[in-house]
Swiss-Prot record:
Record text on subunit structure and interactions: Interacts with RIP1.
Alphabetized UniProt keyword annotations: Chaperone, Mitochondrion, Transit peptide
Region (Disordered): 88-111
Transit peptide: 1-48
Role, per record: Assembly factor required for Rieske Fe-S protein RIP1 incorporation into the cytochrome b-c1 (CIII) complex. Functions as a chaperone, binding to this subunit within the mitochondrial matrix and stabilizing it prior to its translocation and insertion into the late CIII dimeric intermediate within the mitochondrial inner membrane. Modulates the mitochondrial matrix zinc pool.
Family indicated by similarity: Belongs to the complex I LYR family. MZM1 subfamily.
Gene that this sequence comes from: MZM1
Main location: mitochondrion
Record's keyword annotation contains Mitochondrion: yes
GO biological process: mitochondrial respiratory chain complex III assembly
Name this polypeptide is given: Mitochondrial zinc maintenance protein 1, mitochondrial
Organism of this sequence: Sclerotinia sclerotiorum (strain ATCC 18683 / 1980 / Ss-1) (White mold)
Classification via InterPro entries: Complex1_LYR_LYRM7, MZM1/LYRM7
One function term, GO molecular function aspect: protein folding chaperone
């Protein structure tokens, strides 16, 4: 399970940081050092299971929520690297009148 999570994390860094060698290298080094730190954990231990779940969550977040952009030369606009895995919202909350609270699963942003 740990090897699979590690591979998912490396693939997610490649997708999220494609073309940015410095950030890609840093993210992969961070993943490697974290996995090496947890290397001594037994596969069935709660700490190991939690670490693997965390790695999978980070991989999912990188794949779906991280988008890099580059500033266009001579312009104030940015070109975003939106890829097939990027989560796209419908922006329904923007259309809500001012003063309304958004409730998701019974919780608001204040909770």
């Amino acid at each position: 399970m740990a090897l699979e999570a590690y591979r998912h994390l490396l693939r997610a860094t490649r997708i999220a940081f494609n073309g940015d060698i410095a950030i890609l290298t840093s993210a992969r080094n961070q993943a490697r050092s974290t996995f090496l730190t947890n290397r001594s954990l037994t596969p069935e231990s709660p700490e190991s299971i939690a670490a693997i779940a965390h790695a999978e969550d980070v991989a999912k977040f990188l794949r779906h929520n991280v988008v890099q952009g580059q500033k266009a030369e001579g312009d104030e606009k940015y070109k975003l690297n939106i890829h097939e895995h990027t989560e796209r919202g419908d922006n329904d909350t923007i259309k809500m009148p001012s003063g309304k609270n958004v409730t998701i699963d019974g919780k608001t942003c204040k909770d």
